[in-house]
Amino acid sequence: MSRLREKYEKEVVPALMERFGYKNIMQVPKVEKVVINIGVGEAKENPKALEAAVDDLTMIAGQKPVITRAKRSIANFKIRKGMPIGVKVTLRGERMYEFMDKLFNIALPRVRDFKGVSPNSFDGRGNYALGIKEQLIFPEIDYDKIDKIRGMDIIIVTTAKTDEEAKGLLELLGMPFAK
């Protein structure tokens, strides 16, 4: 069992039950999944860029990502329906906890001038979205092997009903929020 999951079961659940006054252990919010998405805009001119993004994401997440395709054609962006425009991966269970542990304790502190993540990035339903400007903050990425600096979106989906509950959950799990 991963370190973060153990922490969730032993420390976070009792703390949240006390803080929000839940009567049943099943009411306590938990992290459902983590979705990581890399938009590869240059994939239409350079198909190799997509492969590089797939490799990066595979190393970061520990599982093979799925290629996302354009839903409709947009002339201004010069894309047609069905063209590959990004890669995403959905983590659940142990892999999700391992990734979050790595994100909170290793990757985020390596961001330049890091003061904490914004406490305003909740969506109103208890999910948290986070943008990262470069993939280099992850320890698996070798600086010499990357072709281009890519950003990514990380969405943490929780079962919390409100943003306040979700923030309490993520704070107790070790998410470094800005004060």
Curated annotation (Swiss-Prot):
GO molecular function, one term: tRNA binding
Gene Ontology annotations of biological process type: translation
Any one of the GO CC terms: ribonucleoprotein complex
Alphabetic keyword roster: Ribonucleoprotein, Ribosomal protein, RNA-binding, rRNA-binding, tRNA-binding
Coiled coil: none
A matching Pfam family: Ribosomal_L5_C
Oligomeric and partner information: Part of the 50S ribosomal subunit; part of the 5S rRNA/L5/L18/L25 subcomplex. Contacts the 5S rRNA and the P site tRNA. Forms a bridge to the 30S subunit in the 70S ribosome.
UniProt record similarity statement: Belongs to the universal ribosomal protein uL5 family.
NCBIfam families the UniProt entry points to: PRK00010.1 (NF000585)
Task performed by this protein: This is one of the proteins that bind and probably mediate the attachment of the 5S RNA into the large ribosomal subunit, where it forms part of the central protuberance. In the 70S ribosome it contacts protein S13 of the 30S subunit (bridge B1b), connecting the 2 subunits; this bridge is implicated in subunit movement. Contacts the P site tRNA; the 5S rRNA and some of its associated proteins might help stabilize positioning of ribosome-bound tRNAs.
Name of the protein in question: Large ribosomal subunit protein uL5
Source species: Thermoanaerobacter pseudethanolicus (strain ATCC 33223 / 39E) (Clostridium thermohydrosulfuricum)
